[in-house]
Amino acid sequence: MRFWYFSAILWVVCQALPSKKQYSVAPELLPGLSEIEDKSTIPEMYAGHMPLAQSNSDDKDEIDYFFWKFSRPDKVLNTLIIWLNGGPGCSSMDGALVENGPFRVNKDLKLVVNEGSWHTRADMLYVDQPVNTGFSVSNSKEKKYDEDLTLTTQHFMDFLESYFKVFPDDQFKDLIIAGESYSGQYVPFLAEAIQKRNAETSDDLAKYNLRGILVGNGWMDPDTQSLAYLPFALSKGLIDQNNPHFSTLLRQQEKCQDRIISRNPNEHQPFQYEECENILQSILTATRDVSADTPSNQVCMNIYSYNLRDSYPACGSNWPDEVLHVPGFFDRPGILEALNLDPSKVPQWKECNLEVYYHLKNRKAVPSVRKLPALLDSGLKVILYNGEMDLLCNERGVLDMIDKLQWGGAKGFSSKTKEYDWNYRDFETNTDHIAGNVLHDRNLTYISVHNASHMVPNDKSLYSRGVVDIYLDDIFLEELHGKDVLVTTSEKDMDDFDNSKLGVLGITDGKPSEEEELEEEFDQYVDELEEGESESGLLDDDKEDETVGATDQNDDKNKGGEDKPNENPDKEKEEQDRQRKRRKGTFKIFGITILVVLTLGSFVFYIYIRKHTNKTRAILIDPSRRQHDSQNKRVSWADDLEHGYDFETDQSQPRSGQSAPKKNGSYTRVPNTELDESFELENL
């Protein structure tokens, strides 16, 4: 009996999750960080293996997902962004160290600051998944791989359950699921699973505060994306009808179309068709430069940024250069230990695991595009952004996908779609740069990023952070050449600006803050006063002065001629508005002054009374026999009140959803030294 008792205790101890402190990462252990002069740019970090909660009865293997979290050390932010790279099978450390994380790895295998890091806007959580991606492992003797997105989704939900137990404060933050390329599949599946979990959870405090999803250059609709390759290549001049391979391309396009049209809607369909996958291969073959004087590294078009060239058959796998530094960084002595990993239990890091790709064939799951209408109809905020130079997941395919979507009572972008130009403002040089264009309709926002690749955060990091600013509504709205322009900036902290958020794109809920509500009530009060004074004739003098001033101006303009009627009623209306605002400002200052005087007077009167009044004491209770009140209390918070304990658990976190602009006048796949690790180029 005693044996079983101690065995049970041992089992419970072994199942216990590590503490938050055990996941802490010391910056001094990471090469390069000690050389950074501005220590405020170094984030607070947590990393390590997170055991997955075993909710799936068919999956008894213990799985550990590797995560790396970054947050600002100087400020508590109320938003958590979970970033996933795609592949499938590509590590999210691409995102952390090559794209939108706080650091990049230089050629000396040291960390340097990434000026466009997203962690200045929200806490960033990078997770390697599915199992056997990056540093995420299973303890089974034989390696097991996820074969369907439904299982991948369940595993990630198990990760979240464990993660929020270790980091409970994060569960109450606004949650955004983000990723790029093949993560266009992961992200909607996860969003749907979270919404389902919330619907089945009666306790509001146990729900996850999912607010939106961000997908960059997403592979969401395989059929539509495949059919967009040839039209996109033609529109960009990458190929023309005089190309000797053009007839072959047309036949390949027809095969793909016929395959899609002929499918039986009553039967389960393949996740994607081989006939459609082959179109991209045919385009690369047709555009290959085989002339003798062409350098070997310029033979093939880079599918991730079509304005660049690469060797064949790499066609982009040797790009970007920074990714080649990451394996060497993780191989440095002490790095794994600094990230709370046991070197004996993790494989050598490689960017993408092709085995994960081979196994995740999705024989049951449907493409994530079918999840989008329900997610949008639920009110979830959805942002899709695309680098315009990407061929693999090009913007033509994404826009065609949106045109087919039915949500919010309409199909695709409607006549009410708002269109904006988008500029990035560098305050250091006081210059604006064209960043792209924005389309917004209902709760869907599409952002085209100017001159950016498949990996927008890599080559346009500051622009990519603007995508987060647009979601958070930390933007300016200006008018330029008669068009509305959204402006994002280089500033680390947008709270430095008086940016009252009203939700110009409807991205945020547009709820005013308490201060804004009070100001609105005061404005209404002033308006009522003005109306009352106007009716009683109290403002006649002001009106008379305005009339006299206007008459004098007309006299000056019309000297030597007859009086003319007002030719610009708009200017007259603007002048009336300015007069009204001045009067309102006067009333507001007067009202505030009265409130301040009354408050100070009440305080002084209270002090005077307290000082000159004798203290009272209870006459019905003998003080010597009085018992402590707490002995008779039946609720715990009574003692807390008596001892002055504060019930506000986290006052430092900002309120969410208060946002509006000021008016101022997959990739997942990055290059690898091993060609066969690029899932997109498998058939090459």
Swiss-Prot record:
Glycans are attached at N443, N451. Residues 650-671 have a biased composition (Polar residues). Residues 514-547, 674-684 have a biased composition (Acidic residues). Residues 498-582, 641-684 are annotated as: Disordered. It is found in: Golgi apparatus, trans-Golgi network membrane. Residues 554-578 have a biased composition (Basic and acidic residues). Residues 610-684 are cytoplasmic. Pfam families: Peptidase_S10. The keyword Protease applies. One of its GO terms (biological process) is proteolysis. It catalyses: Preferential release of a C-terminal arginine or lysine residue. Keywords: Apoptosis, Carboxypeptidase, Glycoprotein, Golgi apparatus, Hydrolase, Membrane, Protease, Signal, Transmembrane, Transmembrane helix. Its EC number is 3.4.16.6. GO terms for molecular function: serine-type carboxypeptidase activity. Residues 17-588 are lumenal. PROSITE patterns: CARBOXYPEPT_SER_HIS. GO terms for cellular component: membrane; trans-Golgi network. It is an enzyme of class 3 (hydrolase). The chain crosses the membrane at residues 589-609. Belongs to the peptidase S10 family. Protease with a carboxypeptidase B-like function involved in the C-terminal processing of the lysine and arginine residues from protein precursors. Promotes cell fusion and is involved in the programmed cell death. This is Pheromone-processing carboxypeptidase KEX1.
